[in-house]
Amino acid sequence: MTQWIAGQWVAGQGDAMTSVSPYNNEVVWQGDSATPAQVESAVAAARDAFLVWKKLSFAEREAIVLNFAEKVKENSEEIAQIIAKETGKPIWETRTEAGAMAGKIAISIRAYHERTGEASREAAGNQIVLRHRPLGVMAVFGPYNFPGHLPNGHIVPALLSGNTVVFKPSEQTPWTGEFAMKLWQEAGLPAGVINLVQGAKETGIALADAKGLDGVLFTGSANTGHILHRQFAGQPGKMLALEMGGNNPMVISDQFGDADATVYTIIQSAFISAGQRCTCARRLYVPVGEKGDQLLDKLVAATLKIRVDQPFAEPAPFMGPQISEAAAKFILDAQANLQSLGGVSLVEAKAGEAAFVSPGIIDATNIAELPDEEYFGPLLQVVRYQSLEQAVELANDTRFGLSAGLVSTDDSEWEYFVDHIRAGIVNRNRQLTGASGDAPFGGPGASGNLRPSAYYAADYCAYPMASMEGGETQLPATFSPGIEL
C-alpha cells in the first residue's frame, strides 16, 4: 500500500517501482506507482478536505503540526537510517537532516505570524484590516537529496495557512516520503489534508496537469522546473514556486588568509553530500601565480584523502555515493567531455562499486567556452584568473544564480564582490552550502522564481485580503457630484 489518498492506504495501480540503496544495490522499498486517475482522486480528496481544514482555527492546525514535530523527534533515528539507506549519505549527515525536519517547524510557525497573520488599524473612522487566506490545494514535489526536511519546508507552511496538499516525493526516495506520511497520520491529521502519490515521470505529469490545483511548490532540477514553467504559462491563477539548481562560482582571492582553512572551506563547498546539494560550488576561480599554485596543491592533496564509503562505515566517511548509477555515469561523462574540450584533471573522478564516484577536480582554464551546466555531483572545475574584476565577470557568466562565494580577508574586495555578483545566496569566507534556516533560499535566472522555503514559504501559501470596515453605512457631509437622494 504505497499511496495515501483520502485518509486510506491504497496500492498503486501503475508501474512497479523500487528504491535501491545506491551503495550496494539492495532493494529497500518496493511498490506500484499512482496512475493519473489515482492522482486525480488525490487532488479531489484534497479539495474536499480543504473546505473543512481551512475553517479550523490556526491553533487547531498548529496543534497537529506540533504533534507531527514530536513524532519526528521520537523517530529521528529511524528517519536518519531510512534516508541513509535510500540516498547513501553518511549517517552523521542524515541525522542532521532528521533534526532539521523538526527544527524548521518552529521557523514556519513564526513566519505565519510575522508574514501572514492578521493586523488592523484605524484611519479616518474606518477599520483597516489585513487578513490572509489560503490558496487551496497545493502540490509539493520533493527532491531526493534532502527527502525529509526540504518537502517539510513546503508542506508545513502550506498546512499552517489552511491549505491542503498532494505530495509527490522523488521516485528515488519513496520510502522517506511514505514514512513521513505515516508520522502525519499518527499526529492526527484529518483525512485528505495531505495525500501521498508515489511514482516517476507519468505521476508527476499527472499531478502538474491536475485541474484542481491552486499552486505548485517544486524543488528539483532546472530542466524539470522549466518544463513546469512552460506548462503553467497563461495560468496566472495558479501559484508556481520553483527551487532549482545552480552552476555556483566560488572565487578565491590572493588574500585568502589561512591556507588550510581555505582548503577546508572549498571541500565543504564542493564535495559535501557527494556534491549533491544545489548550492555546492561547481566552479572555483583561483588567482594565477605562486599563491594560487600552492593553494591548489594543498586542495589536491586533501581531496585525495577524502574518505568515500557506505553510510554506516567506520571510520565515518565524508562522502557517500551518487543517488544512482545513472547519476554516477553523468558525472563521469561530464568529466570526459571537459577533458575532450581541453580540461586537465588535477584529481580524476573514478567510478567505484554501485553508484560510487570519487571526487574530481579539473582545470578548465584552457576551455574556450565552458559549458554552463550543473554537474550535480563531486566534480569541481578550476579556472585561473588575473584580476578580481575578471573573476567576477567569469563567475557571472551563467544562466543560473543560486549561490556564490568569495574567500578574502580584504574588506574592499568583499564590497566589490557583493556589489557585482549575481546570486541569491552570497557568502564570504564560509562554505557556499551554508545559509540561515530563516533566510530566503533561491536565486535569479534559471535557479528559480520565488523563495518558498521554510520562513518565506508563508508568502506563497496565502494571499492577502485587505478590508476597509465600518459598523454601518454613512452619508458624507458633501455628496459626490451628480448624486441626489
Curated annotation (Swiss-Prot):
The active site is at residues 243, 278. GO terms for biological process: arginine catabolic process to glutamate; arginine catabolic process to succinate. It catalyses: N-succinyl-L-glutamate 5-semialdehyde + NAD(+) + H2O = N-succinyl-L-glutamate + NADH + 2 H(+). Pfam families: Aldedh (PF00171). GO terms for molecular function: succinylglutamate-semialdehyde dehydrogenase activity. PANTHER family: ALDEHYDE DEHYDROGENASE-RELATED. This is N-succinylglutamate 5-semialdehyde dehydrogenase. The gene is astD.
